[in-house]
Amino acid sequence: ELAVDDDYIRKNPSKGVYRSLKSEGSGKPAKTRIALTKEQQKNYLRFISKSPMYSHWLPVMVVLLGTGLRVGECTGLTKNDVDLENNTISVNHNLIYRVIDGKADFHITTPKTASGTRTIPILYPEVAEQLRALIEVMDALYPEDLVMNGYHGFIFRNRSGYFLSAHNIN
């Protein structure tokens, strides 16, 4: 722009380039994601189940692998979202831990797009078994309900009975 202002050139050839690049994305090719094979998933879950250090993560890993839920969707699951009779999970919110209005805390957010709100099938009996067992254990261990923005009956909790953070899983 300085060269245009000083009459060295009549038109800035780079004007609007940044806007164009920004609208096209970062210009970097998208990372190729490679899904775990069934065998890799079995090995992963076997490792977790036998590990004294990681075995407490087995229920959340079974649900994540068996449903394809995002971590915030999984940690935000409530008993009302899970229908074990019809083997479905209703996805309509996420549990996040962020700084909002200057305060770091857990918050409920809704999916960014309409397609983010969905009902997914529970295709594997292991997922239903883990969810059923978790609900029973959480009810027994933590009879006091956590409530966040009207949502209650959270299935996944940390060892203290509070919300399970996605940061711990990631």
Regions found by a protein language model. Name each.
Residues 4-10, 133-136:
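Arg/Lys-rich amphipathic alpha helix in sigma70-family domain 2
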Residues 9, 15-71, 75-77, 85, ...:
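Basic, Lys/Arg- and aromatic-enriched nucleic-acid-binding interface segment
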Residues 30, 88-90, 99-100, 109-133, ...:
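C-terminal catalytic core of Y-nucleophile DNA break-rejoin enzymes
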Residues 95-105:
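Compact Cys/His-rich, Zn2+-coordinating modules
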Residues 1-4, 13, 153-155:
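Short, Lys/Arg-enriched alpha-helical recognition elements, typified by the DNA-recognition helix
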Residues 1-3, 17, 122:
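Non-catalytic DNA-binding core/recognition domains of DNA-processing enzymes
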Residues 46-57, 67, 120, 137-146, ...:
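Short, basic (Lys/Arg/His-rich) helix/loop patches that form interaction surfaces
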